[in-house]
């Protein structure tokens, strides 16, 4: 006969087991969209056998400690400055507890996920699964969703998904599921010209057309060129079927940077990425990025071409890249983070983005964390800020639609350096399309406080309610972004947009890195703590011009509510059009030598 205390223990034990069993049979919603995102139309369900490559992000218990570590590594004067992490050290720091990984892996296998398709990468788990398996496992239904502006573009998505309640605290997100983003090239306009006549007067000519020599003159670079070095590689992101053409690049160098004749770039293929040389598609973005990243720096340059809409397991439903449903950002980031330190680029320049609100919050946070991981490993991640000024549609996409300025992502991630655009010289001015503002997702980092709060004090209550004053300020810096000469398909044209500003700024950073490496110092890595600290005196404040937007138009259906006179003005100090200003290479070179 059991004693009373023994009976109590047995009852408690049975109760705990019953609770665990109950939790295993209940589900908790991880992500849910209130409606189908604007610009998408729900279509038919995919075939049950259609294969999807899933990315599962685990909850990071050490997220705050990790982010502080990244800031410390990147802050001049800190004892850890420049001590970038190896891949193994980073993975070990972020790796979840073994029991967490084991429980999720067991769940995947119980759901029928083939063990050989599972890649356990520490804080992320990747796996392939059929639609029917995913629907059972995530208690959801997938459909094809078509781009209302381009019916040839469609993807497999759902509006919500759930996981077992006992696993929910450890799962941050699973994608592709609720991510309906439309990454766009940040090119405001393209003007095709047969020839561009250049005069010997750099000042006069550079108000009409920007070339590498113009940028050298404007930003006081002189004849500085980076020494090609595997430790100082500029990585250029290629998405959306943009191809970097060798013949166009050679012609550009011959005409606009003849001192670099013989320079070249290499290509790395991610997923099903291609770099077609005979495609008839417009590749101005790829040409622009390569021309100025390399033509202004001479640094070793790599074009990372990622399949247009992410990696694809081909099948009858998605037979080719035109019908690809997955996410290129995640694919590129996981590829780069898998590289050993001696193969990792020192700089990653990307001229693509989308409205921040179009990106699910958990996706935004998880992707931003991956950019932070690149920062921890010493990569300067540079993004164009966008070409919609204060915003385009300026309307929230939730159930309650209200007017709102639209920040862009990934430019709004605090761990990337966001580059706005200027035009003209003497004086250099903010250009109207340069995107900026304040993130609705990411809180302003402390090192931005002095600069941004000074601006907000001057702004007062203007535009109150249309932005979040607590948000990360965008952009960080600016560079010329109007009428860049570029070669595409054998013809010279001019391109405007922050997509021109980003590779130009990346090239300047490569030249600064070269100075540090020649002095046996590490590359600059994550730039923002430096920009808002010791580096700030190396930027020219832009106080003329401003951005515009919210004009009552959007690219999906043409109509949107207008916000009269919506704008951000360039002003003394940091502003949400040009950041802290444009680089002065002479001053920056002196600063980085002494860090």
UniProtKB/Swiss-Prot annotation:
GO BP term (any one): proteolysis
Glycosylation sites recorded in the entry for this protein: 207, 264, 278, 298, 365, 554, 557, 569
EC number: 3.4.14.10
Disulphide bonds in the chain: none
Known catalytic reactions: Release of an N-terminal tripeptide from a polypeptide
Main subcellular location of this protein, as a coarse class: secreted
The protein's required cofactors: Ca(2+)
Prosegment residue ranges: 23-201
Matches recorded under SUPFAM superfamilies: Protease propeptides/inhibitors, Subtilisin-like
Peptidase S53 domain segment(s): 209-595
Subcellular localization: Secreted, Extracellular space
Positions annotated as active site in the UniProt record: 285, 289, 499
SMART domains recorded: Pro-kuma_activ
Residues annotated as signal peptide: 1-22
Function according to Swiss-Prot or TrEMBL: Secreted tripeptidyl-peptidase which degrades proteins at acidic pHs and is involved in virulence.
Protein's recorded name: Tripeptidyl-peptidase SED3
UniProt source species: Arthroderma otae (strain ATCC MYA-4605 / CBS 113480) (Microsporum canis)
Lineage: Eukaryota, Fungi, Dikarya, Ascomycota, Pezizomycotina
């Amino acid at each position: 006969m059991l004693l009373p205390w023994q009976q109590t223990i047995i009852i408690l034990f049975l109760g705990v087991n019953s609770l665990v069993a109950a939790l295993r049979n209940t589900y908790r919603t991880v992500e849910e969209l209130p409606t189908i995102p604007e610009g998408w139309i729900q279509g038919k369900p995919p075939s049950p056998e259609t294969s999807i490559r899933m990315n599962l992000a685990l909850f990071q218990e050490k997220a705050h400690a990790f982010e502080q570590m990244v800031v410390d590594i990147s802050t001049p004067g800190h004892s850890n400055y420049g001590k970038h992490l190896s891949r193994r050290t980073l993975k070990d720091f972020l790796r979840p507890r073994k029991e967490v990984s084991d429980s999720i892996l067991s769940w995947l296998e119980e759901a029928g996920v083939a063990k050989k398709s599972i890649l356990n990468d520490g804080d992320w788990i990747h796996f392939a699964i059929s639609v029917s398996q995913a629907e059972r496992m995530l208690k959801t239904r997938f459909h094809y969703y078509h781009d209302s502006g381009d019916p040839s573009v469609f993807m497999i998505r759902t509006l919500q998904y759930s996981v077992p309640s006992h696993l929910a605290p450890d799962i941050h997100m699973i994608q592709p599921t609720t991510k309906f983003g439309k990454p766009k090239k940040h090119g405001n306009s393209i003007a095709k010209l047969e020839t561009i006549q250049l005069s010997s007067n750099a000042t006069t000519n550079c108000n009409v057309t920007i070339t590498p020599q113009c940028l050298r003159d404007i930003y006081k670079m002189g004849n500085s060129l980076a020494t090609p070095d595997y430790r100082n590689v500029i990585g250029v992101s290629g998405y959306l079927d943009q191809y970097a053409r060798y013949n166009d690049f050679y012609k550009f160098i011959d005409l606009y940077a003849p001192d670099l004749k013989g320079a070249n770039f290499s290509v790395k293929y991610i997923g099903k990425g291609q770099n077609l040389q005979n495609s008839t598609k417009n590749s101005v973005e790829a040409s622009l990025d390569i021309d100025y990243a390399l033509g202004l720096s001479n640094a070793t340059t790599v074009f990372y071409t990622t399949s247009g809409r992410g990696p694809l397991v081909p099948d009858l439903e998605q037979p080719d890249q035109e019908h690809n449903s997955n996410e290129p950002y995640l694919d590129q980031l996981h590829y780069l983070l898998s590289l050993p330190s001696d193969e990792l680029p020192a700089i990653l320049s990307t001229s693509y983005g989308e409205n921040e609100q179009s990106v699910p919050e958990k996706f935004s946070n998880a992707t931003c964390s991956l950019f932070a991981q690149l920062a921890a490993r010493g990569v300067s991640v540079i993004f164009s800020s966008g070409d919609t000024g204060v915003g385009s549609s300026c309307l929230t996409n939730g159930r309650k639609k209200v007017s709102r300025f639209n920040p862009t992502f990934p430019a709004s991630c605090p761990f990337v350096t966001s580059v706005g655009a200027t035009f003209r010289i003497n004086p250099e001015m903010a250009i109207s399309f340069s995107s900026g503002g304040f993130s609705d997702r990411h809180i302003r980092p402390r090192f931005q406080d002095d600069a941004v709060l000074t601006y907000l004090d001057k702004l007062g209550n203007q535009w109150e309610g249309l932005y979040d004053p607590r948000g990360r300020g965008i952009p960080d810096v600016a560079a010329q972004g109007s009428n860049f000469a570029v070669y595409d398909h054998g013809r010279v044209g001019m391109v405007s947009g922050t997509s021109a500003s980003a590779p130009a700024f990346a090239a300047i950073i490569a030249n600064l890195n070269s100075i540090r490496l020649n002095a046996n110092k590490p590359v600059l890595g994550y730039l923002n703590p430096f920009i808002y600290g010791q580096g700030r005196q190396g930027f020219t404040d832009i106080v003329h011009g401003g951005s515009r937007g919210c004009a009552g138009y959007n690219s999906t259906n043409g109509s949107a509510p207008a916000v009269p006179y919506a704008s951000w003005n360039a002003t003394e100090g940091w502003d949400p059009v040009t950041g802290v200003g444009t680089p002065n290479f002479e001053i920056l070179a002196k600063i980085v030598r002494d860090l």
